[in-house]
């Protein structure tokens, strides 16, 4: 009885091991299939057919863990005789058959892992080999047309080994030119070799050598691209330009120059037509005179005729913007002397400035002093016209009332007029220069008549009003002198 029970338990253990070995064999056969999703061919003696198996799927483990039982296999479900008969034939094989079946069952897990890892490694290696193969094919295709690899530099330089020894180990595949007939022209930047190399001209050495894109020697210079000027001479000093032998570019000339008072300041050339050597390099010497302005506009009322004549002699012949010329023209028109046409004529000569008596005045020192004086004395054209009209309107009113016309102040000896022009009276009250220029006899106000009253209050008020109209601070004036307009007003009041 006990022997029968032991044999039954032994048979059950043997059958379980046999089923595991068969399941491992079926799994190994399945992994050998390369196509994913192909049906697994079931053994004719077994009913294990889980259907389609997918790689890395969790349902496969469930199918393998619970296989379908085969009809010819031993199972504890079958009772008594069937179990004993089927197992007896299996046990007839002895321990040898059990050992042969036990070996694959014991190494089944290791074989399964090795097979899976081998399959994975082979799949990844196939992809890597395939990518490397494709890359190799692409390189071979590109190697057939060498100009496509580096078309910008291909055959643009001579092959040094070929030039030295006449042979090259690369042969036709060499990307350098074997002779001048293979040399290609390289497309360069528009500014290639148009600017100086800073490194070479600073330390005398350039690490790029002949491949540098900037100028090392004078013979490498190329013409600048159209539409833009090269800044090589601007970036470096005159020393580098003279060292390389490049011609020095002329400085651009300015066509307009504004003084601090907001009006164009004139600059006349010397009579010879050439600039002095000292003024050649100065920035102000390269400013040409504006056509509608004159440096002689800074003269006072005593020299208004001289300044207007010199202003009218400009090449443009346009009316000047100086206040004194406008006042002189207004005076000539009101009094009917006919001198305005002569003064404002385009070709009217300046006899006063060309005479010997003007040799010692302030304007004989050249245009530099006149350009400095101009911003101090220049007035706006509107203010000059309004002031002149107001002055002569008051004079006409006095004449209509039966008063005698005021005595004209004597002109200084230096102010000589042309032969065809009469001496127009000049209003001295609104065109008087500040006192800082009163050292010169030209800028002094004409002396007031001896019979004028010395009204200090009117003098001070007049100086303040004139200073406010001119827009500049009126400096301290000589208290012993009076403006002629206030002297005439005091006479008319009496």
UniProtKB/Swiss-Prot annotation:
Phosphorylated by RPS6KA1 at Ser-490 and Ser-492 upon phorbol 12-myristate 13-acetate (PMA) treatment; this phosphorylation results in dissociation of the CCR4-NOT-deadenylase complex and induces p38 MAPK-mediated stabilization of the low-density lipoprotein (LDL) receptor (LDLR) mRNA. Phosphorylation occurs during early preadipocyte differentiation. Induction: Up-regulated by butyrate in colorectal cancer cells. Up-regulated in keratinocytes after wounding. Up-regulated strongly by granulocyte macrophage colony-stimulating factor (GM-CSF) in keratinocytes. Up-regulated moderately by transforming growth factor (TGF-beta), epidermal growth factor (EGF), tumor necrosis factor (TNF-alpha) and fibroblast growth factor (FGF1) in keratinocytes. Up-regulated also by glucocorticoid dexamethasone in keratinocytes. GO terms for biological process: 3'-UTR-mediated mRNA destabilization; cellular response to epidermal growth factor stimulus; cellular response to fibroblast growth factor stimulus; cellular response to glucocorticoid stimulus; cellular response to granulocyte macrophage colony-stimulating factor stimulus; cellular response to transforming growth factor beta stimulus; cellular response to tumor necrosis factor; definitive hemopoiesis. Residues 170-211 are annotated as: RNA-binding. The modification Phosphothreonine is found at residue 238. GO terms for cellular component: cytoplasm; nucleus; ribonucleoprotein complex. One of its GO terms (molecular function) is RNA binding. It is found in: Nucleus; Cytoplasm. The modification Phosphoserine is found at residues 57, 125, 490, 492. Residues 416-435, 459-478 have a biased composition (Low complexity). Disulfide bonds: none annotated. Residues 93-113, 257-293, 397-494 are annotated as: Disordered. Changing residue 157 to R: Impaired mRNA-binding. Keywords: Cytoplasm, Developmental protein, Disease variant, Metal-binding, Nucleus, Phosphoprotein, Repeat, Ribonucleoprotein, RNA-binding, Zinc, Zinc-finger. A motif (RNA-binding) lies at residues 153-158. A zinc finger (C3H1-type) spans 153-181, 191-219. Expressed mainly in the basal epidermal layer, weakly in the suprabasal epidermal layers. Expressed in epidermal keratinocytes (at protein level). Expressed in oocytes. It is linked to Oocyte/zygote/embryo maturation arrest 13: An autosomal recessive female infertility disorder characterized by embryonic development arrest and embryo implantation failure. Associates with the cytoplasmic CCR4-NOT deadenylase to trigger ARE-containing mRNA deadenylation and decay processes. Interacts with CNOT7; this interaction is inhibited in response to phorbol 12-myristate 13-acetate (PMA) treatment in a p38 MAPK-dependent manner. Interacts with CNOT6L. Zinc-finger RNA-binding protein that destabilizes several cytoplasmic AU-rich element (ARE)-containing mRNA transcripts by promoting their poly(A) tail removal or deadenylation, and hence provide a mechanism for attenuating protein synthesis. Acts as a 3'-untranslated region (UTR) ARE mRNA-binding adapter protein to communicate signaling events to the mRNA decay machinery. This is mRNA decay activator protein ZFP36L2. It comes from Homo sapiens (Human).
